[in-house]
Curated annotation (Swiss-Prot):
PANTHER family (UniProt xref): L-2-HYDROXYCARBOXYLATE DEHYDROGENASE (NAD(P)(+)), L-LACTATE DEHYDROGENASE
Protein name (database record): Malate dehydrogenase
Catalytic function, reaction form: (S)-malate + NAD(+) = oxaloacetate + NADH + H(+)
Function: Catalyzes the reversible oxidation of malate to oxaloacetate.
Keywords: NAD, Oxidoreductase, Tricarboxylic acid cycle
Record: residues binding NAD(+): G10, G11, G12, Q13, I14, G15, D34, N96, I119, T120, N121
Gene name of the record: mdh
Example GO biological process: lactate metabolic process
GO MF annotation terms: L-lactate dehydrogenase activity; L-malate dehydrogenase (NAD+) activity
Binding-site list for substrate: R83, R89, N121, R152
Pfam families, A to Z: Ldh_1_C, Ldh_1_N
EC number(s) stated in the UniProt entry for this protein: 1.1.1.37
């Protein structure tokens, strides 16, 4: 049986951490792609030399040509630039939209059968653009946001209650940004919903509101502390969790930026919702019941994402049309 192949587009902090985690978990052989000559090759060599120490047998390589990702089973995209001081939203969109065009065309040509996870920001708009430029099926292209945001929410709740993070379940709906919607009503500690824990005196609504706001500001908090960078360990771990669910057909229920067309009253959009990820990619959209307040917050988040997508269409009108459906490569015998 042929080993799986994982292609990482972008050799920065997240890309390098993704490669290490893929190696440690032995999910498959890894190729790191980056336009900077020597960078992906150097990181791949360093990580390959880590194998004998850590005890993994993953083959790692670097590439500066999209041919290197040929036949990949999973592609994780981190390429692009972060938002810098003085940079407008449209500036960031313009730069990363061009990157998504190049990446999407590369995936369509060399890895049309892949399951694609996008991590590039602004996430919800970039995963939409990547799907448009690649022409891959909607169920095979997803954005990593909710797993990370939910992980942050779970950590803050576990710290508040003094319990293990393993006993805390929580998820976040909506876009990856200020308008994300953490849902206390659907979040639990050992099966006990957060509103009940408030009634039991474990915390207060005011403290819970602060935790929710801290979750929304999770990325900015890390940027403020680092000063010269942004989060990369947790984003990489989140991306690997999604890739592993696909490669091992785990049927994991994970919050992701997925394509919805009618669910939640939203049409033709990528936005954060709980989904089932298995060998078929996104196999099901989990449509939970939202009360009036939750629905209002969710639609506010959807509208914020729509604003980003509309801005992308103005910057590059061709993205609205999208690419022709990617031609699937012949299956290996």
């Amino acid at each position: 049986m042929a080993r799986k192949k994982i292609a990482l587009i972008g050799g920065g902090q997240i890309g390098g951490t993704l490669a290490l985690l893929a190696g440690l978990k032995e999910l498959g052989d890894v190729v790191i792609f980056d336009i900077a000559e020597g960078l992906p090759q150097g990181k791949a060599l360093d990580l390959a030399q880590t194998g004998p120490v850590e005890g993994y047998n993953t083959a790692l390589s670097g590439a500066n040509d999209y041919k290197g990702i040929k036949g990949a089973d999973v592609v994780i995209v981190t390429a692009g630039v972060p938002r810098k001081p003085g940079m407008s939203r449209d500036d960031l969109l313009g730069i990363n939209l061009k990157v998504m065009k190049q990446v999407g065309e590369g995936i369509a040509k060399y890895a049309p059968n892949a399951f694609v996870v996008c991590i590039t920001n602004p996430l919800d708009a970039m995963v939409w653009a990547l799907r448009q430029f690649s022409g891959l099926p909607h169920n095979k292209v997803v954005g990593m946001a909710g797993v990370l945001d939910s992980g942050r929410f779970r950590l803050f709740l576990a710290e508040e209650f003094g319990v293990s993070v393993e006993d805390v379940t929580a998820f976040v709906l909506g876009g990856h940004g200020d308008t994300m919607v953490p849902l206390p009503r659907y979040s639990t500690v050992a099966g006990i919903p957060l509103p009940d824990l408030v009634k039991m005196g474990w915390t207060t609504k005011e403290k819970l509101d602060k935790i929710i706001q801290r979750t929304r500001d999770g990325g900015a908090e890390i940027v403020g502390l680092l000063k010269t960078g942004s989060a990369f360990y947790a984003p990489a771990a989140s991306g690997i969790q999604m890739a592993e669910a696909y490669l091992k057909d785990q049927k994991r229920v994970l919050p992701c930026a997925a394509y919805i067309n009618g669910q939640y009253g939203v049409k033709d959009m990528y936005v954060g919702v709980p989904v089932v990820i298995g060998a078929g990619g996104v196999e099901r959209i989990v449509e939970i019941d939202l009360n009036g307040s939750e629905k209002k917050q969710f639609m506010n988040s959807v509208n914020a994402v729509k604003g980003l997508v509309d801005a992308c269409k103005k910057i590059d009108p061709a993205v609205a049309k999208g690419a022709a459906p990617a031609k699937k490569a012949a299956k290996k015998k």
